[in-house]
Amino acid sequence: MEFKIRLATEGDAQAVHDIYGSYVPLDYVTFTVENPSVDHYRKKIAETLEKYPFLVAEGADKKILGYACGSPLRPHDAYQWNVEWTIMLAEDAPRRQGIATALYKEFAQLLALQGYRYIYGVLVDTNQASVALHKKLGFKEAGHFENAGFKMGKWRGILWYVKEIGSSNEPPKKPLSLSEAM
């Protein structure tokens, strides 16, 4: 399977919308109940790229096969060296072809260059494919919040996974913006 990893552009908003939207009706992938608009994703891509990577996997036919993006772990200043990531593959993207792994490797490499220390993944606890991916990538389970969300008539828990990608030298420097690191 031929594909490349690149930074997302606002022109990828429709594809990101469609990929994420395919998971919204499922109770075991995301707690989102209604998929936001394409314009929401256009803004999200632009705003994310100011600080964090927003990557897409693009097939040889230019179709977007998946994406990975970062967001703040928590709003408080002391958390600024941590990033929560989201990774999604298109419903029809081939599995076990290295797409998710390639997205992760590029994502983690960029975050490390920026000076981030930890990547966190927050998964619905019944999403075994995502659990397996995080374990394969070297993440460690950091917590389990039972019955954290209610969707489609069921309570679901979330699992927190974490991976250290930066050094633990003190005192840490403020992370660079994505453009400063590239």
Range-by-range predicted roles:
Residues 4-16:
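A short beta-loop-alpha structural element at the N-terminal edge
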Residues 121-131:
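Conserved beta-strand-loop-alpha-helix junction that forms the acyl-donor binding cleft
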Residues 69-72, 120-123, 140-157, 166-167:
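Conserved catalytic-core motifs of GNAT/GCN5-like acyltransferases
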Residues 17, 21-44:
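Conserved GNAT-fold acetyl-CoA-binding loop/helix
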